[in-house]
Swiss-Prot record:
Transmembrane segments: none annotated. This is Small ribosomal subunit protein bS6. Pfam families: Ribosomal_S6. NCBIfam families: S6 (TIGR00166). The keyword RNA-binding applies. One of its GO terms (biological process) is translation. It comes from the Bacteria. The gene is rpsF.
Amino acid sequence: MRKFETLLLLSPELAADAREALLGTLTGVVEREQGKMVAADHWGMRDLAYPVQKHMRGYYVRLEYLAPGEAVAEVERNIRISDGIFKFVTVKLADAVEEVA
């Protein structure tokens, strides 16, 4: 298992319950792929340096999870087909992390 971090830029027009449903879907994908969520940090609404899809504000969420490398492709596929996500980036934080029970 490896440790990954995904930063999401969500539409400011998404309601709080829609955001939670979207994050619940992504959490479900991680767990379905034999991964484990470590943290989900809501950074909140922030001003953007330039317009993204005609918006100057966006809602940031940082997801940190343990998963096999193949799981990232499935998480990113689900992000791409989801409405309300403007941008995302995924980085590998650590190789071969041992899962603590």
